[in-house]
From Swiss-Prot:
Name of the molecule in the record: UPF0227 protein YcfP
InterPro entries per the UniProt record, alphabetical: AB_hydrolase_fold (IPR029058), UPF0227 (IPR022987), UPF0227/Esterase_YqiA (IPR008886)
Gene that encodes the chain: ycfP
UniProt family annotation: Belongs to the UPF0227 family.
Taxonomic placement: Bacteria, Pseudomonadati, Pseudomonadota, Gammaproteobacteria, Enterobacterales
Superkingdom as given in the UniProt entry: Bacteria
NCBIfam families: PRK04940.1
Amino acid sequence: MIIYLHGFDSNSPGNHEKVLQLQFIDPDVRLVSYSTRHPKHDMQHLLKEVDKMLQLNVDERPLICGVGLGGYWAERIGFLCDIRQVVFNPNLFPYENMEGKIDRPEEYADIATKCVTNFREKNRDRCLVILSRHDEALDSQRSAQALHPFYEIVWDEEQTHKFKNISPYLQRIKAFKTLG
């Protein structure tokens, strides 16, 4: 089972495309939708939905995957639910760059301070990070600096922030998923 979390643009047709691409790894891909506008409610909702899926799950090696803001959530929810994560261009600093787009961006900073201390150290090697060198929305170098001490970073030379084509990475993701 692969759980897919969309980014800020929840209505993007790219979400459906990514789900279809992920089905080459595992036919059981589940899109979990969330508001993107209310961080504390989103976190509660995502934890509840992912936990429900895991309770009914028969896959011994589930995976959670997210793009952009979905990557922010996939890393955290995956850690809290003890499943591996794959994140594409994760928005690691939404409290800085979501100003004016969501109701309370400061809630992201609050979530970060309330999350498990040093969670990335405890999550070491359980997240695969794929970053685009041409991310027009986020500073991918800054993301790499924050994540490289803990996770493997794979660099993409072609995709933009929304990462429309993940197919070149499907074999890598599949291998990462099988590590369980």
